[in-house]
């Protein structure tokens, strides 16, 4: 199995599906999508799932898709971010799935580094720490304390850290192998 990981790592041929649930977020969406499009890991598909926006966000999704053929847009009646994520999962074509909230932006090497970390460890999930930024672009205090160094752990240990509120439970910091979801 490790050989498969390393083959994908060196060729960057593994498709990563990035799902973005979208609802009435006209002011932030373009920055979010640009940060995903600008990833150093180029083999991405970006699924914008418009969850019944009423402010023009749905139209912006369509315009963004016209600019980059990696973007696919799905419009659905409002049902909440979980139903939007689930629709994105069902439409994803990638071997890996990641999530980004529509008011967030990500660093250019996020998916490359996370995929390479998972490949090196032979795991089906990798997680990054995150910073929360306020409206004035100042860093907020940590929601959870990030580890001081890289850690490899079992699924059971990872769940324990989440249950003890010692880990980050954000969907947006961890791509997951699609086979892990099925």
Residue ranges of each PLM-predicted region?
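Nucleotide-sugar donor-binding/catalytic module of glycosyltransferases
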Residues: 2-181
